[in-house]
Structure formats: C-alpha cells, structure tokens
C-alpha cells in the first residue's frame, strides 16, 4: 500500500493528465448523481464547498440546492489548521479567501448537528469510505464534530435522512466526492479515522 505522501503525489500526477474541460465534464456527471440521491433531495441543511481548480466543481450544485430552498453551509479557512462554517445566501456572500478560492462571508454556522448531509472533497477515497485529505486536517476536525451515521443504506434507500438521535441531535451523513481516478483500492487509515458513509466518483 502506498503511504499517504506517495498517494497524494500519485493523485496530483493523475490530475495533471486531465484538462480543466475534462474535469468540468466529469464534475457534471458526479454532481448530477449527487442531486438524484434521496438524502440530498430530502435534506434541509447541506454542507458543500467551493472547489479548487483540481476538485469536483460544485458551484452549479450550490446554486441549484439554494434555489430549492435548502440551507447551504460552506467552509471558510480561518487559520493554517482551522476552518469554520458559514451560511450561504447567494454569491454576494462570497469573497476570495484562502488558496484563492471563493469563501463565504455570511453568518457563522455552529449547529453541526443540524447538517443532514455533508459533501466532502478529498485527494483519494476507497471502497470502505476511507478518505485522504491534503494533509492540513481541516475536514478531519469537522468530521470529529459532526458525528457518525455509518449506515450507507440510509441515503440510497430514501429512508429518512432527517432522523434524529434519541438526544434530539442529528447525525450527519457524509458523502465523499472525487474524480474516478481518485477512487483507489486502499487509503492508509486507522480505526480512529472518520469514514465516509458513501463515495460518489462518477463511475
């Protein structure tokens, strides 16, 4: 198995083999599949992200879900090792932030338990839902706070994504998204790592 460093390097090389037009076309397929998932359709609050040039493009999906009346929350990097979530209320709420990508400048969002579905990018994913990030740990800290659902059938079957735990708090369903070449046989992981409940890669 490749180490995390080796796998990140390999994925970066694969990304360089694709043009922006090719990545945008793949993104359309991937987000199209996401939009058809029952858990996305039924969700009240969805966490998404504003994509880097080498990530699955998400702005069209953000616009559509916002137009459908869903609450959209987006990450904002606030330090070298920390991000927070902000509410999205249209493109006027976006400004150029860290890494040169658009970030939200709306109201801070801290009710993590209210997030029904979180769509998470990554450098690589595997069939067990293991995720390899860029190495900064931004999403790892969020995932630790968001809770674990761990039942993949919830999303695919259309069963109530808005089910609550006995204590009244929600249980965020985590979907990893990536390009097909980022879906690998195995991602280095340990028992303490957060796993995705589903991975959508366009295959």
Regions found by a protein language model. Give the residues of each.
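Active-site glycine-rich loop that binds ribose-phosphate moieties when present
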Residues: 138
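A structured binding-face within diverse protein domains that lines the active/interaction site
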Residues: 102-104, 121-124
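Surface-exposed, charge/polar-rich loops and edge strands
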Residues: 2, 13, 17, 113-118, ...
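N-terminal active-site beta-alpha-beta segment that forms phosphate/nucleotide-binding
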Residues: 1-114
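Redox-cofactor binding/interface segments in oxidoreductases and associated redox assembly factors
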Residues: 48-50, 120-121, 201
């Amino acid at each position: 198995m490749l180490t995390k460093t080796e796998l990140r390097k390999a994925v970066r090389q694969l990304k360089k083999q694709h043009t922006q037009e090719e990545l945008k076309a793949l993104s359309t397929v991937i987000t199209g599949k996401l939009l058809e998932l029952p858990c996305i359709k039924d969700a009240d609050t969805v966490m998404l992200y504003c994509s880097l040039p080498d990530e699955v493009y998400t702005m069209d999906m953000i616009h559509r879900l916002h137009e459908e009346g869903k609450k959209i929350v987006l990450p904002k990097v606030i330090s070298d090792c920390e991000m927070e979530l902000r509410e999205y209320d249209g493109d006027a709420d976006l400004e150029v932030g860290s890494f040169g990508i658009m970030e939200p400048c709306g109201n801070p969002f801290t009710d993590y338990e209210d997030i029904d579905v979180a769509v998470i990018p990554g450098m690589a994913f595997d069939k067990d839902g293991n995720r390899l990030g860029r190495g900064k740990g931004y999403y790892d800290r969020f995932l630790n706070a968001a809770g674990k659902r761990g039942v993949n059938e919830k999303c695919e079957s259309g069963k109530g994504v808005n089910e609550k735990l006995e204590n009244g708090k929600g249980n965020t369903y985590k979907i990893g998204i990536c390009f097909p070449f980022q879906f690998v046989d195995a991602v280095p992981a340990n028992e303490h790592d957060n796993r995705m409940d589903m991975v959508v890669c366009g295959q």
